[in-house]
């Protein structure tokens, strides 16, 4: 049997018996940076496309392409300090992995759902004071179909990004009435995520647009 090494963010005396506190883990480490044998253009991972326009294929991404995806979104999207992001998409999809990397770079807090459930999503939004996230249009639609969803507190949410399918204007307007901006993004596995992004200012004026190319 193989056991996963668990790190706890609590103090030594508050950690569970099966976990090592983060402070103790760091204290046992060397202050000298280890040598890194990886180069910028070395392969980082292979991610498979969804097969929307053909058979799924493996896309090779390097450290450089992954970081440029991060830099592009970070420079153009409406990221703010103290961001609290809900991650609903599966981690094998570029629409989930790239935002996770962006949040780590930005210093944002990411709440990862094991699987999408609209009720659990609303509970997370309310409990963790979520400010943003990325969902496909169907997820956004499921969210407002939850019975009595109006009873949840979503006042912390500033905006949700969406993509992978056309977004009905009525759905965008529904969220705008709730005080939540819906901004469309268009991306590809081949571009490590971003290709086009609509800014929040124009998302109301042009709700059917996914914005300008980067």
Q: Language-model features: where?
A:
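Beta-strand->loop->alpha-helix junctions that form or flank phosphate-binding loops
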Residues: 5-13, 183-190, 210-213
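Gly/Ser/Thr-rich phosphate-binding loop
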Residues: 105, 122, 130-135, 144-205
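Conserved AMP-binding/adenylation subdomain of ANL enzymes
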Residues: 67-84, 92-132, 145-146
């Amino acid at each position: 049997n193989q056991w996963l090494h668990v790190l706890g963010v609590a103090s030594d005396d508050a950690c569970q018996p099966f976990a090592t506190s983060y402070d103790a883990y760091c204290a046992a480490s060397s202050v000298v940076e280890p040598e890194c044998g990886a180069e910028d253009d070395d392969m980082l991972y292979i991610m498979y496309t969804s097969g929307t326009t053909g058979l799924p294929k493996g896309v090779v991404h390097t450290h450089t392409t992954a970081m440029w995806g991060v830099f592009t979104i970070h420079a153009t999207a409406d990221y703010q300090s103290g961001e609290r992001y809900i991650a609903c998409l599966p981690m094998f999809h570029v629409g989930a992995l790239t935002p996770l990397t962006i949040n780590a770079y930005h210093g944002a807090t990411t709440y990862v759902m094991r699987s999408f459930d609209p009720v659990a999503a609303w509970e997370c939004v309310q409990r963790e004071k979520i400010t943003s996230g990325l969902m496909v249009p169907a997820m956004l639609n499921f969210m407002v179909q939850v019975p009595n969803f109006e009873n949840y507190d979503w006042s912390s949410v500033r905006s949700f990004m969406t993509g992978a399918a056309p977004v009905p204007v009525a759905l965008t307007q529904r969220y705008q009435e709730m005080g939540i901006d819906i901004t469309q993004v268009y991306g590809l596995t081949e571009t490590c995520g971003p290709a086009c992004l609509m800014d929040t200012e124009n998302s109301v004026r042009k709700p059917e647009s996914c914005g300008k190319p980067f």
